[in-house]
Amino acid sequence: ANPRPQMIGNLEAGDLIVLDLFAESRPQWGDPASTWYRKDGFGQHDWIYCMLLNYGGNVGLHGKLKHVIDEFYKAKESPFGKTLKGVGMTMEGSENNPVMFELLTELPWCPQRFDKDQWLREYTVARYGKSNPTVQDAWILLSNSIYNCPDANTQQGTHESVFCARPTEHPYQVSSWSEMKDYYDPNDVIRAAAMMVSVADEFKGNNNFEYDLVDIVRQAIAEKGRLTEKVVEAAFAAGDKKLYKDASDRFLRLILLQDELLATRPEFKVGTWIARARSLGGTPEEKELYEWNARVQITTWGNRLAADEGGLRDYAHREWNGILKDFYYMRWKTWFDYQTRLLDGKKTAAIDFYAIEEPW
């Protein structure tokens, strides 16, 4: 994927096909607007328009719905379009944001660019089996907010949930290299979730709807968590003990609420992840090893050197039932207790987060 020009310049056309690995954000096919612009693209070689979308398998609504449509047809209609041979998925983690993968795989079948909103209306009918104006409006609202990541934004996947962050005085991104930015109004997500909830009874038993409902409500709770955490920060800075306790308690309740919500779907349960890992083992020892690997991958990534100095802790974090209550809640409760002691004027040692993370 994305080979250097010197590597492919002397190869004959037809000898290879190149994957433009991150085409939805940093295309190299020859788009002058790209930060990874290559004047000659991939030369005479065939290439694939790929969407990376997700890093680390992190959970969260994210995408560039309109941009993916526009960028694909921009490439197709350019001089480089004659060697464009299809689309590809290069995500690090799947089983998230199905709307984006549905859109991507439909592009090659549509000879001309199409209207995003009309496509979404048809998508909801195909996905849920019937037309509902409220559902369609909810999805269009999402497409104009959290699924409307700016063209030039190169963040590594989802706008990460603050629940999953290792606590600090000013927590923002969860993984070390996410480069995420606040590009949408969280209240739009909260409104879209309320719209989906308002018609949920009409879709009872509809697996696709119920999956999306949980995922969208999950995102709304995460947005409320981020808004609440900002109140916690402000209360600590002001030395307001009462507000700090009220806001931090509310934040912890939101984590538990999120955990309870996600228990309703196997796709959002850490137990599903661990059970799958254990099922690959042929002996009791292998099962234990695979479970250990599954747990480490989504938390510390490895030893203290990898987690802290290497910055790899939480790279593959998951906002899932089970780990929210047993891991992320523990971290935040430890942090709030620590800051409460500081507000009370008590001397307290700095928290060794790795020491409390590793046993999980």
Predicted regions: what they are:
Residues 139-143, 193-196, 218-221, 225-229, ...:
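Short amphipathic alpha-helical coiled-coil/interface segments
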Residues 1-143, 148-150, 156, 164-186, ...:
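Catalytic-core regions of glycoside hydrolase
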Residues 197-198, 204, 218, 233, ...:
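C-terminal amphipathic alpha-helical "assembly" element
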Residues 179-201, 215-237:
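C-terminal substrate/ligand-recognition segments
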Residues 320-360:
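Extended, compositionally biased alpha-helical segments that mediate assembly or anchoring
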